[in-house]
Amino acid sequence: MERIASRNPLIAYEKLEQRLAKRTRLYWLKRFSVAAACIIAIIGLSSLISYIRVGSSAGAPQHITLEANAGIRTHFNLPDGTVVYLNSGSSLSYPMPYDSKERKVCLSGEAYFKVTHNEKQPFIVSAFGDRYNVRVLGTEFNMQAYASEDQISTTLVKGSVNVEVKNKIGKIYKWELKPSEKAVCDIDEGKVLITKVNTIYETAWMEGKLMFKNMPLPQVLKRLSYFYNVKFEIQDPVINSYYFNGTFENKQLSQVLDYLKISSRIDYEIKQAMTDDSQGSQSTMVILRKKKGNE
């Protein structure tokens, strides 16, 4: 398995694959490493934004996985011209070659898709091991599918999409969304709640913005958690009943928390904790508690 640090190195990779197709596996890996080093040198600092992981096993097709580093958002083009915006800590994978009867990708996390129209080759976004699929021909939509959660959401901006859900006993449910509709799915039960939404709030993250309108605080904290790559600990359960309004652009986490402190009478404490891994990396924990008395 090799990594190429890059924001959008797909074209370079495809050319490289053609040149090396007739070489042995060992020689291919050596040449691939050299090409990766060249790409890194050209792209420079943008290599910190995301990377591609190319993996394969004996008898199986190659898969390319594109990942956005924690705390950073990025975008890239797929081979068919579809534009994908990938949120912090998210990943997208697809098989190579990318020329089958359908254009299928797998998402973990959050992404916004501007799908190139092709009636003969449907575009499918899959999550949770094919238990959730969004099928389109050409459209724009936002999708959240975090592995740590039991809900998946799809918000349609333009065009139309078909949502297919397979519950835990294998029963399949299907829905069609219209523009400005958001489908929130319980992946275990296969139940979907469809509501009308302002898509600006659902897609603001693409521009580095956070927008909340009368949103329950637990949902606000989820957004902040993914956006800033932090974890939250609520010490006073009453905080879960709070609602929050606000718009933030290019703000540090502490600035958002300060606003939360003033508007919702919440105290916070930021702690750095060592993660349980071999690299000794740190994670950020934010402890929230209700203000007492006249504080």
Where are these regions (language model features)?
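Extreme N-terminal targeting/processing segments
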Residues: M1-G59, S254-E295
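Short, composition-biased local secondary-structure segments
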Residues: S47-S50, E189-V192, Y226-F227
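Alpha-helix initiation/capping motif
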Residues: E2-P9, E67, L210-K213, G246-E249
